[in-house]
A protein has these predicted regions:
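C-terminal motif of bacterial Sec signal peptides marking the signal peptidase cleavage site
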Residues: 17-20
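Bacterial N-terminal signal peptides that target proteins for export
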Residues: 1-9
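Short, non-transmembrane amphipathic alpha-helical segments
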Residues: 36, 74-101
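C-terminal partner/receptor-binding element of secreted or periplasmic proteins
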Residues: 112-135
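Post-signal peptide N-terminal segment of mature Sec-exported envelope proteins
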Residues: 30-51
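Bacterial signal peptide processing site
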Residues: 22-24
Length: 135
């Protein structure tokens, strides 16, 4: 009898744990909503005028866009190549870009855009590239 009660309790605990755990796709959706409602409105960085997130659930991918007031030219492109990775590292350190999602296989495509919405710099964050950003 005691063995049966223990077995039933163990099964119930396992079910509760599984129900309460969120899968990666749910975390991805939750992050995008949180980013757009909480992080983006108060986000401040030099030359950044707007930032948004988009989630692509079927591809396990999140796109972060940083619109700037910079013109598209070689000088700004060169500066973006240096400053943008630093900004991303800072965001990872502040958990504004969550390591856990990247480690679970979510890819972050991060765009630094000129004032005409052309790409000044693009970084792709994966489990492998995350190591480079954290150096």
């Amino acid at each position: 009898m005691r063995k049966k009660i223990t077995s039933v309790a163990l099964v119930l605990m396992t079910v509760l744990i599984l129900v309460s755990c969120k899968n990666t796709k749910q975390k991805l959706q939750e992050y995008v909503v949180t980013y757009n409602k909480t992080i983006a409105p108060s986000f401040r960085a030099e030359n950044v005028t707007l930032t948004t997130a988009r989630g692509y659930i079927n591809d396990d991918k999140i796109e972060l866009r940083f619109e700037t007031d910079l013109e598209q030219n070689e000088a700004n492109k060169s500066e973006a190549d240096i400053s943008f990775p630093k900004l991303i590292k800072l965001m990872i350190d502040k958990d504004q870009v969550p390591r856990q999602l990247i480690e679970e296989g979510v890819q972050f495509d991060v765009y630094f855009l000129a004032d005409d919405n052309t790409v000044l710099d693009k970084e792709v964050l994966t489990g492998e590239s995350l190591k480079d950003f954290l150096k």
